[in-house]
Structure formats: structure tokens, C-alpha cells
Amino acid sequence: MKIGKKILIMLVTIFLTSLVALGVYATSIYNFSLGEFSKTFKDYGTGSGKDVIADEKPFSILLMGVDTGSSERTSKWEGNSDSMILVTVNPKTKKTTMTSLERDILVKLSGSKTNDQTGYDAKLNAAYAAGGAKMAIMTVQDMLDIKIDKYVQINMEGLVQLVDAVGGITVTNHFDFPISIEEHEPEFTASVEPGTHKINGEQALVYSRMRYDDPDGDYGRQKRQREVISKVLKKILALDSVSKYRKILSAVSKNMQTNIEISSSTIPKLLGYSDALKSIRTYQLKGEGTTIDGGSYQLVTSKELLKAQNRIKGQLGLKKSTAENLKTTASLYENFYGGDTSIYDSSSSASDYSSSGNYSGSSSDYGSSSSYGSNSSSGSSSDYSGQNSYNQGNYQQPAAGTGIGN
């Protein structure tokens, strides 16, 4: 199962909204909330070491959506991180940014010395498969040249349970055919018939994921995902039943892990970030498509990486990078192909999410491919020559059997 970036945003926004909503509940539900959120806590020791939330400072969060589709997996946290989003929250500027990280970016894996995959070049999403959340966090840190303060990882079952916990939502299928993804993902047999219907969690998942039969493709899917998040948030904010709120918290606690501590002492501090969460701007770090040893990868340009790093560092109050001192473990486009990349200028305008869950922007906000295009190499690293000699001496194929890079 592949989790979409927008669905991950939906789940995390619901999680953050639940945190902010804690302050309006009585002592009994408050104590229950603390108990449920305590189940989600797991610290990998990869953070900055500073208690940024207690100090009410800007902080960063790595959001990971975990692909748990295989029936052979024995843990809900075993698999790939098919979506990774770097979030910055600044209580002073009252701004939050979300930078989606393309899963196929070619990067050097960062991890402990005991992990034999450390130092290998692979797709970004392979970091989780090779070393769990810890390696994923360390790899993104080194790619973006920052320290990640917090992380949140969520599995797909969370969306299903959350929609069911709020009693379902009402949507309208404007197509003249049922919305279904069973042809491409046979494990999902639910569908949404044409017309207006109240749907459950399984149907909401299908409604949010279908794109192949949509004339607008991914843009149409994004539109439906925005519809789902706004309707779930509206129901959460209008809750008048303690039992329903308990179901929501239980769904979150079963399907999420984080090192954000939820306690009686941290909740007042977390509420101080509520204004920053009312306006969320989204971006995407995306590279240029190419083929290496038969595998599809994204190679980021120094221009786009510098732009992303400085936007993130600016939000966190850190010293910005320059073209001369750009630090990263990502494999840069220039190091493979050389040349002047100034003609490369994929769309990077931000999209806005309001506190009501509404969205403005167009599909072009998520970047577009340039004239370099995909499959610009001949499909084998042995064919690289001249300007590409840098790659020949540095590219390593991950160990066999790991599934990394596929």
C-alpha cells in the first residue's frame, strides 16, 4: 500500500487539532487523553537535545507515513516510509510550513556505525526500510543540514479508524461511475457510488486515493482529500460526546508514534503553538527524474535544495546556507550531469491551508518536471562518462535482499 502525501497531511492535521482541542474537556477526558497519548511516545535520541517546546521556540517535525501493506509484515511499523514531510512550526511568526520530500530522491543513507546500510546511496524512502525511523530521521537531517527536533509516524489504518470514530462523513461522488481502487489495489474492495452518501472509514480511504479514473488525475485526488480533511476536522471541532472523543484518541494512539511528549506540563506549552497551526503553507522538494541501473530516481538541483534549506532554516531561526557552503548528502543533479542549471525553475509556490481545513492553490504548486525530463540517462550507470565520472566512483548499490532502491 502506498500512502499519499496529502493523506499524511490529513492525519497529522487531525492529530494536531486533537492536541489543541484538549483544553476544552473536563478532567476525566483530559486524564484519559494523557494516557492515550502516552502510548504513542518513543524517543530515538536523534533530536537537538533542546526542549524547544518547553521554551516555546520554533521547532521542526519529520512526518512519516508508513507503508504497511504486506501481509507478511509482523509489525504495524514495518515497511517503507512512502511519504515524508518536514514541518516547521514558529510561534513568533505564527507560521507553519510543510515541505514534502520526494520519496525517490537519491541520497546517502545516514545511520549508526552498527548499521551496515549506513553510507550507501539509495532512495530517500529506503532509509526507513534499512534502519527504521531512526535512520530516516538521520538521513533527512543530513540531507537538509538541520537537526530535527520531533518526529511523527503514522500508518494508514489511522485514517480508517478516525473517520469511523467521528461517525462517518458525507461526500458527493460527481462521477457517473463508482469510485474504486480495487483494480490497482485489490485489498481495498470498498467503493463510493455516484451521488451523495455518508461513507465510513474504508470508503473514505478509497475516496481519497483514487486518481487513475479521474480526468484531473492527482489534482482531482488532492481535491477529494482536502474535502475529507475539512469534514473530519469539522466533526472533531464540533464534538459534544466524550465517548466519541475517546474513540478518536484511541485511533490516534494505536496508529501513531512520536517523541512529542504529551503531559500535564507540556499541553499548556503546546497550546501556545495553536495560532501557528491555523495557517499552513506547503512546498515540495522534488528532483529531476533519471534512471540508474534500471531504477528510477530523483536528482535534486543545488538551486532547489538551497531554496528548500533556507526556507526551513529561516523558519527555525538558523543561519542560512549559501551556494558556496551548501551541505547535503543528496546526490545533486550537477554532480551527475554538470552544466548550467539556471534554466531549471520548477514551480515552487506555496499552497495555503486555513484553520477550517480549506485549501487554495493549484496542482502546479507541487512542482513540475523540466526539460531535463525523466530517463535522461541511458539506464545503466556503466554508460555514464565525461561529466558523469563523479558518479561512477561514488555510487554504491545497496546490499542485495534489502529492497532498497526499488
Curated annotation (Swiss-Prot):
Keywords: Signal, Virulence
Gene name per UniProt: brpA
UniProt entry tagged with the keyword Signal: yes
Pfam families membership: LytR_cpsA_psr
Entry protein name: Biofilm regulatory protein A
InterPro entries referenced in this protein's UniProt entry, alphabetically: LytR/CpsA/Psr_CW_biosynth (IPR050922), LytR_CpsA_psr (IPR004474)
Note: As a result of luxS inactivation, brpA expression was decreased by 70% in early-exponential-phase cells. Also, brpA expression was down-regulated in response to the deficiency of smu486 and smu487.
Annotated region (Disordered), positions in chain: 347-406
Location(s), subcellular: Cell envelope
Cellular component aspect of the GO annotation: cell envelope
KW Protein transport (keyword) present: no
Similarity comment: family membership: Belongs to the LytR/CpsA/Psr (LCP) family.
Annotated knockout phenotype: Cells form longer chains and sparse microcolonies, are more resistant to phagocytosis, show greater level of platelet aggregation, but are unable to form biofilm at least in vitro.
Signal peptide per UniProt: 1-26
Biased composition (Low complexity): 347-397
Species annotation: Streptococcus mutans serotype c (strain ATCC 700610 / UA159)
Role according to the record: Involved in biofilm formation, cell division, autolysis and the regulation of acid and oxidative stress tolerance. May be associated with systemic virulence in blood.
